[in-house]
Amino acid sequence: MSQNQEFSKKEIYNLNKLQKRLRRNVGEAIADFNMIEDGDRIMVCLSGGKDSYTMLEILRNLQQSAPISFSLVAVNLDQKQPGFPEHILPEYLEKLGVEYKIVEENTYGIVKEKIPEGKTTCSLCSRLRRGILYRTATELGATKIALGHHRDDILQTLFLNMFYGGKMKGMPPKLMSDDGKHIVIRPLAYCREKDIQRFADAKAFPIIPCNLCGSQPNLQRQVIADMLRDWDKRYPGRIETMFSAMQNVVPSHLCDTNLFDFKGIKHGFEVINGGDLAFDREELPLQPAGWQPEDDENQLDELRLNVVEVK
């Protein structure tokens, strides 16, 4: 009995520690990008997946201790997919006492009519969903729309655009909609997917499957996700370093003439920030930038990496 109690205490301790980390990550993202302001009404898009459940839980937690006042309203879009468990989210949200709205729109029928069988429907589905959510935000008087994308999603999008789109473009933590009427925020931008997964498992959220529509998976995104997971396993700290790189862009050391006036460089031109690397080999830090060891793993030996050795 005492052993079970001790195990339970350890689980509670680990959960609290994990929740604090997620809170810290979300709090830092909110502060860095000014995501939430006093008096905001945040529409939390709740799909029934681990990410959106975690986002709602952490925002509710922060709401109790934040120095500013903001309200939350959870919104789920029931797209009339076969087998969608309509009762799960209302029961969960009523138990929490969270204001919510279930929007019923048969986007599934539209997508099935337009997209051939066996093809990926995610692109059309997301466009339809976006329009409905923008309209709902207006109806609810929401000042911000919160989506549950996390750090891994942002990195995957960066590599998708690099590998398949020829652009160095990721997924912004905060953006203005094309019509200029809605601000979209991603409070989980600094959160690791594996932390979210552990938190969701520990909290036993009533997860709704994401493949009810029968769409084929996005194979390109899956390839990128597998690649990043492999890197994270073989090279601890690489994911953190890559995300840190997205926050430390040096346009003068890239090749985009729209971002930097290379033609304007002449004798007497001021020194470019970042140094002269035309002849010198850049020294990299002993430890990957932004890397933090797992709570339950030993500190790895520090390795000095050379830029030509990074695979």
From Swiss-Prot:
GO terms for biological process: tRNA thio-modification. InterPro entries: Rossmann-like_a/b/a_fold, TilS/TtcA_N, tRNA_Cyd_32_2_STrfase, tRNA_thiolation_TtcA_Ctu1. The keyword Iron-sulfur applies. Gene3D superfamilies: HUPs (3.40.50.620). Pathway: tRNA modification. [4Fe-4S] cluster binds at C122, C125, C213. It is an enzyme of class 2 (transferase). Its EC number is 2.8.1.-. Binds 1 [4Fe-4S] cluster per subunit. The cluster is chelated by three Cys residues, the fourth Fe has a free coordination site that may bind a sulfur atom transferred from the persulfide of IscS. A motif (PP-loop motif) lies at residues 47-52. It catalyses: cytidine(32) in tRNA + S-sulfanyl-L-cysteinyl-[cysteine desulfurase] + AH2 + ATP = 2-thiocytidine(32) in tRNA + L-cysteinyl-[cysteine desulfurase] + A + AMP + diphosphate + H(+). Keywords: 4Fe-4S, ATP-binding, Cytoplasm, Iron, Iron-sulfur, Magnesium, Metal-binding, Nucleotide-binding, RNA-binding, Transferase, tRNA processing, tRNA-binding. It is found in: Cytoplasm. GO terms for molecular function: 4 iron, 4 sulfur cluster binding; ATP binding; magnesium ion binding; sulfurtransferase activity; tRNA binding. It comes from the Bacteria. Disulfide bonds: none annotated. SUPFAM superfamilies: Adenine nucleotide alpha hydrolases-like. Its cofactor is Mg(2+); [4Fe-4S] cluster. One of its GO terms (cellular component) is cytoplasm. PANTHER family: AMINOTRAN_5 DOMAIN-CONTAINING PROTEIN, SULFURTRANSFERASE-RELATED. Belongs to the TtcA family. Homodimer. Catalyzes the ATP-dependent 2-thiolation of cytidine in position 32 of tRNA, to form 2-thiocytidine (s(2)C32). The sulfur atoms are provided by the cysteine/cysteine desulfurase (IscS) system. The thiolation reaction likely consists of two steps: a first activation step by ATP to form an adenylated intermediate of the target base of tRNA, and a second nucleophilic substitution step of the sulfur (S) atom supplied by the hydrosulfide attached to the Fe-S cluster. This is tRNA-cytidine(32) 2-sulfurtransferase. It comes from Escherichia fergusonii (strain ATCC 35469 / DSM 13698 / CCUG 18766 / IAM 14443 / JCM 21226 / LMG 7866 / NBRC 102419 / NCTC 12128 / CDC 0568-73). The gene is ttcA.
